[in-house]
Each structure stands twice: as C-alpha cells, then as structure tokens.
Amino acid sequence: KPILNSVNGEEQSLATVLPLVKKYGASVVGLALDENGIPKTAEGRFEIAKRIVERAEAVGIDRKDVYIDCLTLTVSAEQAACRQTLEALHRVKTELGCKTCLGVSNISFGLPNRELVNRTFLTMAMEQGLDLPIINPNVESMTGAVRAFRVLNGIDKNSLEFINAYNDAVPAAPVKKADSNVDIFAAVYNGLKNEGAAATAKLLETTDAMQVVNEMLIPALDRVGEDFEKNKIFLPQLIQSAN
C-alpha cells in the first residue's frame, strides 16, 4: 500500500489531502504541525495529531493507515525539544493507537559525532513506540541499533534475525522431506521441533527407539554443542535445538 507524504493539521491540508488518501486507498503521513508552525510542547503536537486522526476517520480512513510524525528538531539549537518529541510520540502511540514515523538525523545537526547522537536518539524513540524510523540503511550502526532493540524488546523471537545478520557461520542444510538420518540431524541442529518430531515418528515405524537416540539424536546434539563452543551458533539456537 502506498504511503502519501503528507498531511498536516492545517485546514486546507486536511480538506485537500485526506479525500485523496481515501479515494486511492493509501496510507498517509500526518505531520504534527499546522498554520502556526511546529508546537514547542508535546501537548501541542499531540493535539494536532489527534485532529489529523479524527479528520481521517471522518472521511473513512482507518487510523491504522495514519503514520504520525511528531517531528524531530535540532537538539543543538533547541535542547528541550528532544524530550517534547519523545513525549508526543509516546502519547500518540499509547493514546491514539497510531503508527508513528520520525526522521532521525536532524536531531544531531550542528554537533560532532552525529552518528552517535543519531543512534542514541533512534533507540530512545523506538522505546517510546516509533514504528518507522527514517534512517540511512547503509549506516551499519543505525541498522544495528534497530536489530539490537528488536532483540532486547522481544520482537526478534529467539534473536534469529540478529544472529543471521552477525553470524558468519554457514547454516546447516535445510530439512528435506525424506526419512533419512540427515533429516533428523538437520531438524535437531536447526531447532525445527515439528519437522524433527515428524521425521522421528516416521523413522520409529521401522527403527528401534534406542538406535534412533544413539545414532541420530545424540550425534546431532553433540554437533550443536561443539558449534556452540566454537561460536558458530549462539545460545538461542542451542536452546531451540535442545527443545
């Protein structure tokens, strides 16, 4: 779905842009400013955001299709503005239930070591409910901050995305649908509980249970332990394999 950039709290903007968004079935970015400019307070920006959401719903646009941008101001010029942006973002997320977006790099304009400031601000904003950060994806420290946040906040289940991004080890071969020793080995190694259970159940139709344990399951778990010690796999993968 396209995202139209953008509408703001000014009456002319609301009356012109929102009907187009509804007509073409798009989503829309709502800027927390109006004819008076950008409010200095979180309360002021929240009220504009609320106005945008209510007007959007009045023309039949679901609030889940409205991305509110609480606007990032340069901290070197207006240091208090950072907290106001974050507070407004939090209120939009919790009280209006909207998705949020925010440009990140403007926060550090005029400061040395801009990347450090940007990364820290990004993490603070995500903690307050930021959904769509506008960042340069080619800056590894920024994408890395997003990945780490997703792990720490329980979004990246079992840290799989993080591990795949930073683990140089070659992954084990995918499980095939044939009933062979390799299938059970790969299922255990990769922590594929359902596939491993199915392969084991099928093999038990023709093979003694102790033979399956001693010749297939134990060697697979041994390999998992060895690769964990060599830092080829990591704790979430070890736990999945054990399960």
Task: Give names to the regions the model predicted.
Residues 1-65, 73-101, 105-243:
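ATP-dependent carboxylate/acyl-activation modules
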